Regions:
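The feature primarily captures lumenal catalytic ectodomains
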Residues: 1-408
Length: 408
């Protein structure tokens, strides 16, 4: 019979959370805890979206405050058992617990950085910041990402990836200050840390209006919306510079975002960095590219970081997905009604009053969908929502020759 731990004697004395409810107005600094002789343990073969990793106190109790969260309802770590004593390495000194190191750009900004705010709220010297790795091959990606972070923020982070079992003299564990979904709003300390430590002495680019495009190196099926190349042409005629963020250093990205007056683009992770600028004078427009709350949540993040004139532009039309899939959301691609988007952008001051845009014709849509079909190696069929199933349809009616069906 398993005995339930006495949580009144572990961490801050509270029961483990089933959800992580982060109030963007509620300070977290008072909830920082210190664990003596803490053991950090990640299961060696565990890697990916959720890893088996726990922090234990000197009585071998798992510390609930060290659980990492992706979103309000989804954890990034799952419990594991206390490691064998002879496999634990000693790591002297006092360290800050950073949570999970995840190498994807957006998750790095929103999750990996989510406890660094505590660096401004501890009054004792530390050796550095400890992270559990999401993937076992982490040396190159960690060096690259933390190096890029140092291009845009001071000071550089002295980090250590815990790919073995370690016992530290003292581990400072702050609450997680941000994440994805609702957690994008971040705690007050997290927002202050980002905006305070962000470098702001970059040389202006001369590009006042920027469109952050997804037509470059994004080869993931459903990463774009139909006709994005056409939208780029329309915006270039309005004076916008088409910017492929993934082709630029973080320093150059921030240089563009800090010197622009207007930034437009489909919802995606580059807007986290845009929002980190916290510029009250910046005009931000996030174009919804697929059903869901992403665009609105990105705008809410803009607002709490101090960007007052930020808007979500939701003008989706029809949607298609890959035949054979049980859930359309996995590979869904949508049309954006350019005529409605044009009206909205004019009203918000993002384009000139004389602009007149037309929706894509069915011929253009079919051309775009055919490229999607070849990329997905599956027929493209219309769907009426993210939960629609196309499992009753063969992947390809004509084997090896993906087609487009504008209607079923």
């Amino acid at each position: 019979m398993k005995i339930k731990p006495d949580y009144s004697k572990i961490g801050n004395g509270k029961e483990p959370q089933l959800t992580y409810d982060l109030d963007p107005k509620e300070p977290l600094a008072g909830d920082i805890i210190t664990v003596k002789n803490a053991v950090l343990a990640k299961t060696p073969r565990s890697q990916g979206w959720r890893i088996a990793a726990s922090v234990f106190d000197e009585d071998r109790n798992a510390v609930p405050e060290a659980v990492c969260w992706i979103s309000r309802q989804q954890t990034a770590t799952k419990p594991r058992t206390y490691p064998r004593e002879n496999r634990i390495k000693e790591l002297p000194g006092t360290w800050l617990y950073g949570g999970r190191f995840f190498p994807a750009f957006g998750h790095f900004l929103c999750e990996t950085l989510s406890r660094l705010w505590a660096l401004d709220h501890i009054d004792e010297p530390i050796e550095g910041v400890l992270f559990f790795p999401a993937y076992n091959e982490h040396e190159e990606s960690a060096a690259q990402l933390f190096g890029q972070l140092a291009e845009i923020m001071d000071p550089a982070i002295n980090y250590k990836i815990c790919d073995e079992f370690y016992r530290v003299d003292k581990l400072i564990i702050p609450p997680q200050g941000s994440g994805v979904g609702r957690l994008l709003l971040s705690s007050p300390e997290m927002r202050e840390y980002i905006t305070t430590h962000l470098k702001r002495d970059f040389k202006p680019t001369g590009h006042d209006k920027i469109y952050i495009s997804r037509t470059g190196q994004f080869d993931k099926v459903s990463s774009r919306f139909l006709g994005e190349k056409r939208l780029e042409e329309l915006l270039e005629a309005e004076g916008y510079f088409v910017f492929h963020a993934q082709d630029h250093s973080w320093e150059d990205q921030m240089r563009h975002y800090q010197s622009a007056t207007h930034i437009l683009g489909p919802d995606g992770s580059p807007f986290h960095m845009v929002n980190f600028t916290g510029r009250a004078d910046l005009n931000v427009g996030v174009i919804q590219r697929r059903p869901g709350p992403d665009a609105v949540q990105m705008v809410h993040q803009s607002n709490v970081y101090g960007i007052e004139n930020a808007h979500a532009f939701a003008h989706l039309g029809r949607a298609w997905s890959s035949a054979g899939d049980r859930r359309a959301a996995l590979k869904m691609v949508c049309e954006v009604k350019f005529s409605d988007l044009c009206k909205d952008l004019k009203e918000r001051g993002f384009i000139s009053k004389k602009a007149k845009w037309r929706d894509l014709t069915d011929t253009k849509i079919k051309q775009a969908l055919l490229a999607q079909a070849k990329s997905a190696e599956a027929d493209q069929r219309p769907v009426d929502g993210v939960d629609a199933s196309l499992s009753d349809f063969p992947v390809c009616v004509k084997e090896g020759k993906p087609q487009v069906f504008l209607t079923n």
